[in-house]
Regions:
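Short secondary-structure capping/junction motifs at helix and strand boundaries
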Residues: 91-92, 118-120
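Ankyrin-repeat interhelical turn detector
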Residues: 111-114, 148
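Short, surface-exposed loop/turn segments at secondary-structure junctions
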Residues: 90-97, 135
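Leucine-rich repeat
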Residues: 26, 96-97, 130-131
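BTB/POZ (also called T1 in voltage-gated K+ channels) oligomerization domain detector
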Residues: 1-92, 213-250
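Amphipathic alpha-helical interaction motifs in eukaryotic regulatory proteins
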Residues: 45, 52-56, 78-81, 85, ...
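Residue-level signal for helical boundary/lining positions with a hydrophobic bias
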Residues: 36, 108-110, 144
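Acidic, serine/threonine- and proline-rich low-complexity regulatory tracts
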Residues: 3-6, 100-102, 106, 119-250
Length: 250
């Protein structure tokens, strides 16, 4: 969840918005927690069709006020601007679980604002982060599924298929927990947040492979799981007209 920013005032400047205080900027983005980012309208127009439309329709106001406490808080606005403007996000103080949750929220923000170029940069970053174990594989899988990116899901599977849960099941997205000793991609052992946040088409495609997933899997078995997931997902998407967010007719 977003960090506690109840002390924010119109004058608050901290590590999240300090980079975005250009005195020549003509737009102020006000995050849902009140933190303000001074940016140029041409930058918003260039990177988001939704912001472009908002700026065309707005009156003389120089503020865009964001209200969604989950995906429009200051930490997500900061990440979005970093990706859009070519800055390296500051991840030093972010733990693996919190960064995974933040990635899910950022992915939803990019979808809401149709930010195509930032989304592509984000996808490249996720490939790197999952490989370097900066973000855990199951978190990347969920984010990739929500962005309908099969190849990134497969990269997450390849990296983490042998990883096991160490805690008990939980529905809390902030508690990285599943049934101990089971693969993080065995959905019968997955925490409820993982099931809830993964689109149904991706859930079913992975579920069909769970009978193969277990301790001491050989590379041949792992490759079979990944190939099976790829085939099942393609078949399921044919049945939904390519829209993975739709329900599945069985």
């Amino acid at each position: 969840m977003p960090s506690d920013t109840s002390e924010n005032t119109p004058d608050t400047i901290n590590n999240l918005n300090r980079r975005y205080q250009d005195e020549d900027a003509d737009i102020i983005l006000v995050a849902s927690d009140g933190l303000r980012f001074r940016v140029h309208s041409y930058q918003l127009r260039a990177h988001s069709s939704v912001f472009r439309s908002m700026l065309e329709l707005c009156d003389s106001s120089h503020e865009i006020i964001l209200t969604d406490d989950d995906i429009e808080a200051s930490d997500i606005v900061c990440l979005y601007l970093d990706l859009s403007m070519g800055h390296e996000p500051d991840l030093e103080a972010t733990g693996m679980v919190q960064l995974g949750i933040r990635c899910r929220r950022l992915g939803d923000f990019l979808a809401k604002y149709d930010a195509a170029s930032a989304k592509q940069t984000f996808i490249y970053a996720l490939y790197r982060w999952v490989e370097l174990e900066i973000v855990s594989s199951e978190r990347v899988f969920v984010v990739a599924a929500r962005m309908d990116n099969r190849d990134l899901c497969i990269a997450a599977l390849k990296k983490g298929l042998s990883w096991e849960w160490k805690n008990v099941a939980s529905s809390d997205e902030e508690t990285q927990a599943g049934y101990a000793g089971h693969s993080i991609f065995d959905l019968s052992a997955a925490p409820l947040w993982m099931i809830k946040l993964t689109p149904p088409t991706y859930t079913l495609a992975l579920m069909r492979q769970c009978r193969k997933i277990g301790k001491g899997m050989s590379n041949e078995v792992k490759n079979g799981v990944i190939q099976g997931f790829r085939i099942e997902l393609d078949l399921l998407k044919e049945g939904t007209g390519g829209d993975s967010s739709k329900g599945i007719d069985i």
